[in-house]
């Protein structure tokens, strides 16, 4: 039995790269879609917010000397490319996906309209939110928090390369231990990087829990949705 009826899954663009240096790794995106399909078959309504860091990062090297707002818009367009790839892979896997963009590109994807997104979710379709919040200076983590709150998701699942939040960087400190669960205030007090400050504050204010887990662990998404001890739960 799933522990949640409606979830917001935040995927980083980097997660789509697999072992590649950039871009979209076909085997990786197919495997991710299989994991999502398994959850939808349990009757869970799934919405996805996807990043664009595998193609372009507004805050990174490719944008040196560039106007920040322009760089952020380029990053948003990168998320649209990822969303289209994810949606196409879902369609081929037998899922019905709908890509909705926060910036208008009507010939490519439909615009984000909240009632329409809710309708799609109720119909069992997977909704993929592209282009972040549609505004520069906001991360896709913030978009995940915002869309999660808007659609009434019960939890934001942040899929990362690490299987939870640790007391220290597990790559640098072998004594680092994983938190099973932690409150928002504790995470802030310990300066633990769960999400950026804006996204984190929005989730905290809306009492929207965050689960940090590794998308690279086979079956992890299903275990999270079933309420098992996987990753780290950040709660009020």
Swiss-Prot record:
It holds the Pfam family AA_kinase. GO terms for molecular function: ATP binding; UMP kinase activity. GO terms for cellular component: cytosol. ATP binds at residues 10-13, 53, 57, 160, 166, 169. It catalyses: UMP + ATP = UDP + ADP. The keyword Transferase applies. UMP binds at residues 52, 72, 133-140. Keywords: ATP-binding, Cytoplasm, Kinase, Nucleotide-binding, Pyrimidine biosynthesis, Transferase. Inhibited by UTP. Pathway: Pyrimidine metabolism; CTP biosynthesis via de novo pathway; UDP from UMP (UMPK route): step 1/1. CDD domains: AAK_UMPK-PyrH-Ec. It comes from the Bacteria. Homohexamer. Catalyzes the reversible phosphorylation of UMP to UDP. This is Uridylate kinase. It comes from Polaromonas sp. (strain JS666 / ATCC BAA-500).
